């Protein structure tokens, strides 16, 4: 039995399995198959699978007369790119937008409408570079972020996010194409000392005081960030970057695409999340879940600890090298309170800290002292975490910190019992495969 002899339901199932390209070929066989291959329900499946759209929209977001026509318009608009790469980039942005919609709509509102092929051509001509295919596509879908907004929260809405330690604040935005051009032509070449690398362009930067930028090598497709002495560090494993200028096949992946995909994965899995401080929300790059975040509970006191590599103040050419990390400590008292010898206390207060600092599994320092950053947090049962950040340098790429906090039940002014130690489980401070 041939396809023409199959029932409508069987034919629909078969066509949905063979995909849009083969369905278009089947439509050329006979009038009956052409009718079946043009059904809206069929092309709605193709649009959903390939483009994640549930209504017929063209690439500009405008309504199309049918799902089939919408699919055709998408294919025509992106005909100069491998289709599998188009679908992958679309999925990358869809995942990021979906997360932002649910968790950080203020940042989603800063995403700009994608650029045109003419915009990309003008950009490449002006800077005399050839963008990797995945990066071109990323900008076809989204032209970075608006860097100004009426709410005055510009420094906190970066898509990549950031961290803080003492007075060192970072919040990284994905730059729109016009800012990539301006930063590359003006600030970057004049101020940052990389002018010999003419294939480098500025793709992302922190808009707050700290100097942190991300640079794309348009020839190799690798993404870099700089250290305090202008050394370039790859932000993505080199082995993963390939075929960045190949218009054929489906193996193209540059560091920008890999970087944003990994960032989206961390957001979606809850590895990193939005933090609100002083009524200002931002994406915090401090990991929130194991194994990159340690979690321990002692006598009702929970302590979470994690770190972020700080390349912009590191100096890897020092002897010994200085790998700098920010670390975040979050402590809270569980709803049942502090439990000592069977007695529940509704509060406890920090008195003392003890750190054991290791590099390459060897103890390099023991730190003992009162308070943390000059504070003695009073924890109340069931209330929000007390959070503090600090930073430290290591002579190697692999370090860790563990130790303990000494608390007093009740408060320091009105103790309700003897001091007790709260364990801080070891957390890593290591040079990561992906640098954000």
From Swiss-Prot:
Residues 75-111 form the F-box domain. GO terms for cellular component: SCF ubiquitin ligase complex. Gene3D superfamilies: ApaG domain. InterPro entries: ApaG_domain, ApaG_sf, F-box-like_dom_sf, Knr4/Smi1-like_sf. GO terms for biological process: protein ubiquitination. The keyword ATP-binding does not apply. Residues 295-436 form the ApaG domain. Disulfide bonds: none annotated. Pathway: Protein modification; protein ubiquitination. Keywords: Ubl conjugation pathway. Part of a SCF (ASK-cullin-F-box) protein ligase complex. Interacts with SKP1A/ASK1, SKP1B/ASK2, ASK4, ASK11 and ASK13. Component of SCF(ASK-cullin-F-box) E3 ubiquitin ligase complexes, which may mediate the ubiquitination and subsequent proteasomal degradation of target proteins. The F-box is necessary for the interaction with ASK proteins. This is F-box protein SKIP16. It comes from Arabidopsis thaliana (Mouse-ear cress).
